[in-house]
Amino acid sequence: MSGAALGLEIVFVFFLALFLLHRYGDFKKQHRLVIIATLLAWYLCFLIVFILPLDVSTTIYNRCKLAVNSSPAESNSSFVTLAPSKQQCFKPWSYIPNGIMPIFWRVVYWTSQFLTWILLPFMQSYARSGGFSITGKIKTALIENAIYYGTYLLIFGAFLIYVAVNPKFNLQWNQLQTIGIAAANTWGLFLLVLLLGYGLVEIPRSHWNGAKRGYLLMKTYFKAAKLMTEKADAEENLEDIMEEVRKVSESIKYNHPLRKCVDTILKKCPTEYQERMGRNMDDYEDFDERQNSYPSEKSLVKLHKQVIYSVQRHRRTQVQWQILLEQAFYLEDVAKNETSATRQFVHTFQSQEPENKIIQYFYTPTVEWYWECLLRPWFYRVLAVVLAAFSVIVVWSECTFFSTRPVLSLVAVFIQLAEKTYNYIYIEMACFLTIFFLSICVYSTVFRIRVFNYYYLASHHQTDAYSLLFSGMLFCRLTPPLCLNFLGLTHMDATISHTDAQPTAYTSIMGSMKVLSFIADGFYIYYPMLVVILCIATYFSLGTRCLNLLGFQQFMGDSEMTSDLIDEGKELIRREKGRRQRQEEGENRRREWKERYGNREDSTRNRVVHTEQKESSFSETNTNRPLSKYTRTNGRTERDRIELLQDAEPLDFNADSINDDPLESDSGRYQPGGRYLSMSRSRIFEDV
């Protein structure tokens, strides 16, 4: 098993990152370089989280071997009180040979740092640029990142001056490398504590509230009202941008030098707008150089950037609205089925996606009723209690991990108890669960961040390139300080434990933080205690209340604005539900009509074809007799009678449903004129 566990986890983490990227990104529409860069960033960050427990177990085994081979006096001063030297050290099942982990961590760490500080910011500006050529986009990206890179050089220069002025230090390459790592980890730890303080409280509370059916339904109504406002704003913004594009397209003719730029902008517009602009454009009129009303290339670049953003935002709000409708309909079905006497879950609308036959066989309506109406609320409550216990352990350990005698950090206590018995499976599971919980608290907060609709991770392939690159950049900055904080909680970091024990391979590549004592002995130890204040603020929803006072509507049960938005969202859901029910009723009527009269029409057509074949054969055998005109007259009369039968209206005829069917409108068969075309559609104003 030497190195096998490392190889299996490398493969598993790759497919995990690929699955998550497929859920949020769009492989077909987005650029390949964006997909590859984001996948690499997510993959490297997830690798650190999954491989670090293996590094901890291997380090504990190596410490045991050193303790056994050393003298008793040295073993007494070691990190853990060990048994006599006669005791044999057991090799862990996931043991990684010496020399592999340092190289592995060095490649992973420096690649992720190159992505987060150099490549991904440049690709962000490149993807957001509205230039029409590669050179123009690169120029825009360099200009935007000049201030960005200058800020980092200023911070690094400040650290460098501090070390150069201090006479205790002799500047060497390793120390310069340590200064750069310390600067990056300091910035990451500053943001990490803010996100962690929110996630430690919000994740258990969200699962506890998930057991409240009425709470989830009211919150869904609230989201519907806010999303409808955003959806209307996105549609209005798109209309304004498309109007500007139309004016530009009409002013710049086919032989204008900037016409290629206009064509590039038109390709980014929705299909219906492209067709509308194509009908209104007159390419036969030449442009006049004497006119001064033509837009410049700089204005076209700005317009191109606005088109990309508005189209993507409009598409995202449309998809999110459909997803929110499905969620609201399902929660309303759960509320109705809770009082069902049959104990079988009944859906108002059938799922539009085809269900798996295996899942459909086991997940019957009865099983679904017991899970949704009885078991799921209790499962969410138990899960919320477990997550709350984890949060308490993490908060206590963050406040006490600097104490080594006695050891107060609960995470360090659990690891040291397992270390004495060499229970490597327990050590790896405890390390993995702890760092996985920390990652969930931080990463889930990252996925929920929404900065003025400019950066937003949306599922169902609706995340734009800029947000994907920003998330990869943020992950690469947060993961290294997160892992260092975890090693501090377990006292595996020599800077925290104040011992000469063998460090982990991950800690060894970071260098000794003693070069910057005010960071190693001050910021890294006392700043994580701020998580207590952030948890208290999150528990009392101070941030939510402040945003609500600033005008950003948040879901608060005691707010009058929240009640108004809930009522508005409930009315919106009711209208959409009625519209969908009418659509399904129309489809059911069409289906019944086809089943009732489809066979009769087919038999009539077969009879007519057989009659025409007999008449044509009779006319061929009697070519000298003038009977062909009578045969044609009879055939035409028969065809007219059949067409009248086909065009007859059934008793439950609905003109709206028939005209909305694309199959009927595009079939190309004969459609009668007269009063049937002039009849107005029924129920045309019901949705107003």
Swiss-Prot record:
Domain of life from the UniProt record: Eukaryota
One of the protein's GO biological processes: adrenergic receptor signaling pathway
Glycosylated residues, chain numbering: 76
InterPro entries named in the record: GPCR-associated_LMBR1, LMBR1-like_membr_prot
Pfam families in UniProt: LMBR1
Annotated spans, Disordered: 600-673
Biased composition (Basic and acidic residues): 600-617, 635-644
A Gene Ontology term for the protein's cellular component: membrane
Entry keyword Transmembrane: yes
Major location (coarse): membrane
Positions on the Extracellular side per record topology: 1-3, 54-99, 166-180, 403-426, 489-515
Sorted UniProt keywords: Cell membrane, Coiled coil, Glycoprotein, Membrane, Transmembrane, Transmembrane helix
Cytoplasmic side: 22-32, 121-144, 202-381, 448-467, 537-688
Topological relation to the membrane, as annotated: Multi-pass membrane protein
Stretches with biased composition (Polar residues): 618-634
Role noted for this protein: May associate with G-protein coupled receptors and regulate downstream signaling pathways.
Record PANTHER family: G-PROTEIN COUPLED RECEPTOR-ASSOCIATED PROTEIN LMBRD2
Protein name (record): G-protein coupled receptor-associated protein LMBRD2
